[in-house]
């Protein structure tokens, strides 16, 4: 049912008031009580009317629920009104911080729009409550009419009721005065009381103000107040006029009643009576109030007593139980309906009571102010709503106005039955009760307090029975108990008169009996006056010291009252401790903080005022102090400044004195160092001059002799002979250079030089004595040798040139003197031959056959072996290289016992590399070598290397260093070579650096002035130990080499890459450039790597990233299969494996009916009529004319017409086709008009030969004959068509869409025949060469009988034949500036028949260059570091012997040492080396002995890059070499060519020089 639904929806917060309840109290522990109500309807209504009424009631309930929800939302929106002012204030405060910014005000406007929309929504919601308000107004109008009628009756009976009421009240006052006092004090402690009387509920409109003021009766009228609140909230807006009008009517009645009340109120003598009298005038109906007050005061005592008995689980006892049963039986007789109530009571716990009291206290505190403000309006509203028929469901019974009046008059009030509101009541009454229920449920406070579940379990319209299950919570159970007690108390009041009549008799009997009375009374009651006057205050003496409050009570009652008041007292204390104490503590704390804040404010104000007073009074004192401090500060600054100036002057004077002293000391030190260096130089010069005079180096150098230098040298060395000078060594550290004169220093220097010479001779003599084995005749003593001119040894199988023979004499003299030397002839002058001639000279003249040690780079090992074998065949050579096992076997040939080698020794000369020297140092150091030759001695230029240290530790009689560049980078390398040959003279690198290095290197770098005297002294020191000759001085037939620097500009791609690298480098670019010019091994590795990246950009941008092959996406499916071979089937037909993923399925019905000819269509008839019946070739006359011209028969013409196009093309290519016949006809007509047989046959034979040639040209598609027969076509295709590149590159490519007809074999057979017809496939494809050979040679098939092939046309352009595009080589060439210049240069060099050496630093660049040369079809070979020794020998041999090789690609480090490449006349450096001497050695591979043509050297450089910086640094290093070795102070002249046409001119000029 919908009623059950309504009750179930509100079971959490609705209360159901049940009429006429029969209560059965049982002491159980259950938490709820089940009430089953059976309602019987009357016989006047039918079931149909009930259903209609219930349906209508349900609709009203639904509407009320909706309105309730709207009202709740309205309350939420109403809260915005309270905060509107606060929001406006907050916005005003925020607007101050917005600083008049447009964005901030835009944000404010958006907020205002938002809140405006919310306010409009609130107004719409507020207007939606009109329907509910109209319904409530109707109810109020009906109730007002009834109230007016009842009020008119009450006005007429006011006087009589007041008189009777005052009398009854005075009678009851003597017994209830003490009770009122105690209950009023108890009510103040508690939040709300737990009992209510039926009369108070009946007249709630007249006593509402007293209920609000008195806290003890607040909970009693809570249900009524909830109804008042709900109605007020509904009527506040729309019914103000009606309410005010009604309130005026009520106010007039209340005024009259107040007047009557003031007249009838008694005088109050005691304090309790005054309190009661002060509350009486506030009521609206004094007669009812007086009656209710008397009943309330008399009932409170019983209620409190009953509460205490409930706590002890003893609800009622003895007599009370019997009286309650009588009341219940009387009520059952008066009820019209049968209501069955089954209830259970719970045991109450003290904790639950306290919690409920706490909740009630909190709610009362919150409601206090609101109830006082709206008290008068609520009274008027309640009087308008309620009428005489209203009653509380929990009230056991109500009395009408007449009954109350009769009771006030003193008549006994008998309970009159009142019909409760049930389902069968009037509609208006039911609606009014339900509205009350709903309004009660709206109030959150009532929901919180009265949470009772009620569920309609069953409704039977036939039996007129409605069963409702009501579950009462603890609060309602307690309330029910109080209602029961109220019913009991009403019965007691009726019997009160009987008890009062017996009171006098009881007092008299007590006086007569005395102490023997069994009944113990505490105090005797006072007799009341008959006219209701003042009470007698005569009391019996209190014997138990318990408070009796002026009443007669037993000991048990006194204890119960005391216990009740104690509990109330402790409850109040607990509430105070729990609530008020915390509030007071917070309040005290807040007061203290406010007080402290005020103190601080006062103190700050006082301090500010005090400071103002001080400023006014002590301003002059403050100014005086300020001036005094300023004066003191200025005085201190003055004296500090004065002291600082004096201190600075003193320091300056001391500094000047120290500088002067330091300068004088430096001058003395410079003089001393100059004398020291002069002493050391003089010592070295004397030794060098003496050795030079012995070996005559000046005569050997030829044109390089300096006359002025020789004169100075002779003047310096006059009167000094080392042979006659005593050999006394004087340590220069012990010499006092400050006091010694020049002559004494020169004498000591001569003694030291003589000592060095003597030690050198002794060392040589000792080595010779060890190797002579004690022979008598010794020819190796150099002192016994005179100045003999040495001739060419006879065992030397070559003829030495004049300068080479002089070099042999110089080397022989060095050997005789026991001095080591450096043969530093320019590359290409035959240093190898001169060194081999010295070994031959020792073997031939002195019979010294070894052991000789030759150490050379790995690239020249085979060259040395070949040279020695060629020039001195008698020498036995031991090639010491290979793996460890090979070297172990070679070491067996060493003869360590015989230190003197002869011609029959196992070997004479051992040739090894520098790597082997380092790895096998322990074995090589054990040998004593007669002569050690180091080829390319710049390999030991570093004194810190392991090569230098290991070779210096070898036991050798003489050491010879062969190098064309003794100085590569700096003077330190020269000192390393000099110390290697003469450790005793050149022992300190620091001294050598002080002598020469600083001056010469600074001159080369900064072009400073060079000390010529110091340079001459250096040359004088070096001359005895180093022989240096250049080609132009000693070799007149060898022409000069031309060096050309070709400057190029970066291409666009290179420039972008270069800028990107510069931007990504964290280090400054200038620092990187300096690192590029500095070849010091200690440089930062990161810098070197950065330089290499820039050099890559200069060489070619593809060194970073190669161009990718471009190909479209293939939208195809590729075939996948396993092995295709089958048993007994050597040939397998393979269809096209690549197909399109898209397949079009043609419906078979369409193919059969519309495409294939059949009996249902006319396709066959149309084909016959078009191709046969109406064909022009079907005419007989036309066919005759055609056959006359072509020579074909009528049937052949028809076959040609009806044949396929491809078959006709194949037929035309046959030897005796129509074309051949036409050629025959044309030849006959050209030669002779007569058709004689002789002419015809001769011409026919000629035509047949041409047909054979034509067939041969077609068969040999790639042969020489094809090229000869198609010269024009070949040239046109190669020059024009193949030069065109594809400009469009598709993104996707795919195979054609395949068509399939499922279930039709005819289509698949026809498709396969067209795609794979053997005749067409053979005609389109070319016959393989192997098949042609078998047909022509083995099977003897004539060429003109070969089947037609190669009809598929070849593409006009190779780049258009496929969508796969390879990177363009033209773009590859033009993207590199160097490669573009090289491409132009090679064209000119190829025309001039030059042969070119191209040197590279990077092997990856060599790979790119090979691709370029292959594209240009230049023949070339390559040699780099990865080439093996055997391959290197073969490559050099091929280059020297094969003139068809145009270009030789070499790595500068691998191919620039010790090899002879004189077949080339042009050298191109694609990129330069860090060390200029490496490049010099590389170019001298071609510019050397045996070169008959002019040698031109091209060096490709990029302007404005790191390469230009490296080139400048290389020129500085070359200048140092020229200064030291040749004495030149001017740099070498190198021609520079800018980017343009000068390269071709230079190449042409070099070609002209070569031809001349």
Curated annotation (Swiss-Prot):
Residues 572-697 form the DBINO domain. It is found in: Nucleus. It comes from Vanderwaltozyma polyspora (strain ATCC 22028 / DSM 70294 / BCRC 21397 / CBS 2163 / NBRC 10782 / NRRL Y-8283 / UCD 57-17) (Kluyveromyces polysporus). Keywords: Activator, ATP-binding, DNA damage, DNA repair, DNA-binding, Hydrolase, Nucleotide-binding, Nucleus, Phosphoprotein, Transcription, Transcription regulation. Residues 244-255, 523-538, 770-779 have a biased composition (Polar residues). It comes from the Eukaryota. InterPro entries: DBINO, DEXQc_INO80, Helicase_ATP-bd, Helicase_C-like, INO80/SWR1_helicase, P-loop_NTPase, SNF2-like_sf, SNF2/RAD54-like_C. The DBINO region is involved in binding to DNA. Its EC number is 3.6.4.-. SMART domains: DEXDc, HELICc. The gene is INO80. This is Chromatin-remodeling ATPase INO80.
């Amino acid at each position: 049912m919908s009623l059950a639904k309504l009750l179930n929806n509100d079971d959490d917060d609705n209360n159901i008031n049940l009429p006429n309840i029969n209560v059965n109290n049982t002491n159980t522990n259950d938490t709820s009580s089940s009430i089953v109500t059976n309602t019987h309807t009357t016989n006047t209504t039918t079931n149909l009317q009930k259903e209609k009424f219930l349906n209508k009631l349900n609709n009203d309930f639904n509407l009320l629920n909706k309105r309730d929800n709207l009202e709740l939302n309205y309350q939420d929106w109403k809260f915005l009104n309270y905060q509107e002012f606060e929001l406006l204030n907050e916005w005003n405060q925020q607007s101050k911080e917005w600083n008049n910014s447009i964005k901030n005000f835009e944000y404010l406007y958006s907020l205002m729009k938002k809140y405006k929309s919310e306010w409009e929504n609130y107004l719409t919601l507020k207007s939606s409550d009109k329907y509910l308000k109209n319904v409530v107004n109707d109810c109020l109008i009906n109730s007002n009419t009834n109230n007016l009628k009842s009020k008119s009756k009450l006005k007429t009976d006011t006087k009589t009721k007041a008189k009777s009421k005052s009398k009854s009240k005075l009678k009851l006052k003597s017994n209830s005065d003490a009770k009122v006092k105690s209950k009023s004090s108890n009510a103040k402690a508690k939040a709300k009381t737990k009992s209510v009387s039926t009369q108070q509920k009946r007249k709630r409109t007249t006593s509402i103000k007293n209920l609000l003021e008195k806290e003890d009766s607040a909970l009693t009228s809570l249900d009524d107040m909830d109804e008042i609140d709900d109605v007020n909230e509904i009527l506040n807006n729309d019914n103000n006029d009606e309410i005010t009008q009604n309130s005026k009517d009520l106010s007039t009645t209340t005024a009259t009643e107040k007047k009557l009340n003031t007249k009838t109120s008694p005088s109050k003598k005691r304090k309790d009576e005054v309190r009661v009298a002060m509350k009486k005038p506030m009521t609206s109906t004094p007669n009812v109030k007086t009656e209710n007050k008397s009943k309330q005061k008399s009932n409170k005592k019983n209620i409190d007593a009953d509460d205490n008995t409930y706590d002890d689980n003893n609800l009622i006892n003895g007599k009370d139980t019997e009286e309650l049963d009588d009341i219940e039986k009387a009520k059952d007789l008066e009820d019209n309906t049968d209501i069955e109530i089954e209830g259970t009571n719970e045991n109450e716990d003290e904790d639950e009571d306290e919690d409920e009291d706490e909740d009630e206290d909190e709610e009362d505190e919150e409601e206090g102010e609101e109830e006082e403000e709206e008290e008068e309006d609520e009274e008027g509203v309640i009087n308008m709503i309620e009428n005489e028929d209203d009653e509380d469901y929990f009230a056991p019974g109500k009395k009408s106005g007449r009954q109350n009046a009769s009771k006030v008059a003193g008549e006994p009030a008998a309970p009159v039955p009142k019909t409760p509101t049930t389902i069968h009541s009037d509609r208006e009454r039911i609606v009014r009760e339900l509205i009350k229920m709903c309004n009660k449920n709206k109030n959150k406070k009532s929901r919180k307090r009265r949470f009772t579940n009620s569920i309609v379990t069953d409704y039977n319209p036939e039996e007129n029975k409605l069963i409702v299950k009501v579950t009462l919570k603890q609060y309602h159970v307690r309330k029910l108990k109080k209602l029961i007690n109220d019913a009991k108390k009403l019965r007691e009041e009726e019997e009160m008169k009987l008890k009062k009549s017996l009171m006098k008799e009881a007092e008299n009997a007590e006086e007569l009996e005395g102490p023997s009375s069994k009944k113990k009374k505490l105090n005797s009651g006072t007799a009341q006056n008959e006219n209701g006057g003042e009470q007698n205050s005569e009391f019996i003496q209190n014997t138990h010291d318990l408070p009796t409050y002026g009443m007669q009570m037993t000991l048990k009652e006194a204890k119960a009252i005391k216990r009740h008041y104690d509990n109330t007292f402790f409850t109040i204390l607990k509430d105070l401790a729990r609530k008020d104490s915390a509030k007071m503590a917070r309040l005290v704390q807040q007061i203290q903080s406010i007080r402290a804040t005020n103190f601080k404010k006062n103190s700050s104000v006082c301090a500010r005022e005090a400071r103002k007073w001080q400023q006014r009074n002590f301003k002059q004192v403050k100014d005086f102090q300020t001036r005094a401090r300023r004066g003191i500060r200025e005085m201190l600054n003055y004296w500090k400044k004065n002291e600082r100036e004096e201190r600075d002057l003193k320091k300056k004077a001391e500094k000047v004195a120290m500088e002067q002293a330091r300068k004088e000391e430096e001058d003395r030190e410079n003089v001393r160092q100059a004398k020291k260096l002069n002493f050391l130089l003089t010592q070295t010069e004397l030794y060098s001059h003496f050795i030079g005079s012995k070996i005559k180096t000046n005569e050997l150098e030829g044109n390089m002799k300096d006359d002025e230098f020789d004169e100075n040298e002779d003047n310096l060395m006059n009167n000094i002979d080392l042979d006659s000078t005593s050999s006394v060594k004087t340590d220069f550290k012990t010499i006092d250079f400050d006091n010694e004169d020049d002559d004494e220093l020169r004498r000591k220097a001569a003694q030291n030089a003589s000592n060095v010479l003597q030690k050198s001779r002794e060392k040589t003599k000792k080595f010779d004595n060890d190797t002579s084995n004690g022979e008598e005749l010794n020819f190796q003593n150099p002192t016994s040798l005179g100045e003999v001119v040495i001739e060419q040894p006879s065992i030397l199988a070559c003829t030495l040139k004049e300068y080479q023979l002089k070099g042999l004499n110089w080397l022989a003299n060095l050997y005789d003197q026991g001095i080591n030397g450096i043969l530093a002839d320019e590359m290409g002058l035959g240093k190898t031959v001169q060194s081999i001639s010295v070994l031959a000279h020792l073997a031939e003249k002195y019979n010294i056959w070894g052991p000789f040690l030759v150490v050379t780079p790995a690239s020249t090992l085979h060259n040395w072996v070949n040279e020695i074998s060629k020039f001195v065949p008698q020498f036995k050579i031991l090639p010491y290289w290979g793996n460890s096992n090979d070297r172990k076997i070679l070491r067996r040939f060493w003869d360590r016992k015989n230190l003197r080698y002869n011609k029959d020794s196992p070997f004479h000369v051992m040739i090894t590399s520098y790597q082997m020297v380092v790895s096998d140092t322990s074995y090589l150091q054990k040998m004593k070598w007669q002569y050690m030759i180091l080829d390319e001695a710049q390999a030991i230029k570093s004194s810190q290397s392991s090569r230098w240290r290991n070779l210096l530790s070898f036991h050798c009689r003489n050491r010879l260093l062969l190098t064309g560049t003794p100085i590569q980078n700096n003077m330190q390398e020269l000192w390393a070579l000099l110390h290697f040959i003469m450790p005793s003279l050149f022992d300190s690198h620091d001294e050598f650096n002080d002598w020469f290095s600083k001056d010469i290197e600074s001159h080369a770098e900064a072009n400073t002035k060079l000390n010529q005297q110091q340079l001459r002294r250096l040359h004088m020191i070096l001359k005895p130990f180093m022989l240096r000759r250049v080609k132009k001085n000693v070799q007149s037939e060898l022409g000069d080499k031309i060096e050309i620097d070709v400057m190029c500009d970066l291409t666009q791609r290179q420039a972008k890459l270069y800028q990107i690298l510069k931007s990504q480098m964290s280090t400054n670019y200038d620092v990187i450039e300096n690192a590029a010019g500095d070849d010091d091994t200690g440089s930062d590795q990161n810098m070197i790597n950065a330089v290499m990246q820039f050099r890559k950009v200069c060489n070619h941008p593809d060194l970073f990233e190669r161009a990718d092959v471009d190909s479209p996406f293939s939208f195809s499916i590729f075939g996948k299969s396993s092995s295709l071979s089958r048993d007994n089937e050597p040939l397998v037909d393979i269809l096209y494996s690549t197909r399109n993923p898209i397949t079009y399925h043609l419906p078979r019905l369409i193919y059969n009916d519309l495409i294939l000819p059949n009996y249902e269509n006319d396709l066959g008839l149309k084909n016959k009529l078009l191709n046969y019946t109406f064909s022009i070739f079907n005419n007989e006359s036309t066919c005759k004319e055609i056959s006359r011209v072509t020579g074909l028969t009528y049937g052949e013409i028809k076959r040609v017409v009806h044949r396929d196009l491809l078959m006709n093309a194949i037929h035309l290519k046959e030897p005796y086709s129509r074309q051949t016949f036409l050629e025959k006809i044309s030849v006959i007509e050209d030669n002779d008009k007569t058709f004689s047989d002789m002419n015809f046959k001769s011409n026919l034979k000629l035509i047949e030969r041409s047909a054979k040639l034509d067939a041969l040209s077609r068969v040999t598609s790639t042969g020489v004959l094809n090229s000869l027969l198609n010269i024009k076509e070949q040239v046109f295709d190669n020059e024009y068509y193949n030069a065109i590149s594809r400009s469009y590159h598709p993104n996707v490519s795919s195979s054609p869409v395949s068509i399939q007809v499922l279930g039709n074999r005819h289509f698949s057979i026809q498709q396969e025949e067209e795609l794979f017809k053997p005749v067409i496939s053979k005609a389109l494809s070319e016959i393989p060469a192997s098949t042609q050979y078998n047909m022509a040679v083995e099977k003897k098939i004539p060429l003109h009988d070969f089947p037609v092939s190669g009809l598929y046309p070849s593409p006009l352009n190779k780049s258009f034949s496929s969508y796969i595009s390879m990177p363009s080589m033209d773009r590859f060439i033009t993207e590199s500036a160097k490669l573009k210049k090289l491409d132009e240069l090679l064209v000119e060099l190829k025309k001039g028949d030059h042969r070119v050496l191209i040197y590279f630093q990077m092997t990856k660049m060599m790979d790119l260059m090979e691709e370029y040369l292959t594209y240009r079809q230049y023949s070339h070979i390559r040699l780099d570091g990865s080439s093996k020794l055997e391959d290197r020998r073969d490559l050099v041999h091929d280059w020297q012997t094969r003139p068809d090789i145009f270009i030789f690609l070499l790595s500068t480090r691998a191919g620039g040492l010790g090899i002879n490449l004189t077949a080339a006349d042009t050298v191109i450096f694609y990129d330069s080396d860090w060390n200029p001497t490496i490049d010099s050695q590389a170019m001298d591979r071609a510019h050397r002995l045996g070169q008959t043509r002019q040698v031109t050297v091209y060096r490709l450089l990029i302007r404005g890059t790191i390469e230009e910086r490296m080139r400048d640094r290389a020129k500085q290093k070359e200048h140092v070499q020229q200064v030291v070795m040749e004495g030149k102070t001017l740099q070498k002249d190198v021609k520079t060519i800018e980017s343009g046409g000068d390269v071709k001119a230079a190449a042409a000029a070099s070609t002209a020089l070569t031809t001349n």
